[in-house]
Amino acid sequence: GGRPYRIALLEGGSPDYGVRMADFVREGASQWEAADLGLWFSFTGDTTDADIVFQWRESFGNGNQAGVTDLRWSNSGRVVRAYVSLATRNAGDSLFTDDALLGAAVHELGHAMGLPHSTESTDVMFPVTRVTVPSARDRATVRLLYALPPGSLRAPPR
């Protein structure tokens, strides 16, 4: 039920940016839609209308880090907007592979929907993901998260 997550894709941001960068995000959204969780995504050119805003950068300068998601929360504990940054290169200045970029897109979309990191390396939400398809555990976490009333779950203190 509900409405789709609206995604805005900001072009550019990295010298390596190309139209296929948007394809990684679209494919990542398709992977979550295919997980049969009742989630779906639409794409908008208007960032003010978007729930999730993707932008690109060359590198985070931090090892193989490929993505970061910054969440904005409502007072009632709902994610109101997510800002996702994806890098095209690692700190060693090597281009990320297509699989790494797809995995990062799927992983960061998980964060944008409110999912935390997983301790299981076969999950797309594992911090150093090698996976491009949400696992059974990832899907179960989404089901649990979306079954709870807003504000009943809080991120652990850092």
Predicted regions and their residues:
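Residue-level recognition of the N-termini of beta-strands and the immediately preceding loop/turn
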Residues: 5, 50, 121-122
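A general boundary/transition motif marking the beginning of the first structured unit of a protein
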Residues: 16, 20, 130-133
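Metzincin-family zinc-dependent endopeptidase catalytic domain
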Residues: 19-106, 112
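Short, internal active-site loops enriched in acidic
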Residues: 13, 58-60, 130
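Disordered inhibitory propeptide/activation segment of secreted metzincin zinc metalloprotease zymogens
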Residues: 1-19, 71-76, 151-156
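Metalloprotease/metallohydrolase-associated module, dominated by Zn2+-dependent proteases
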Residues: 70-100, 116-158
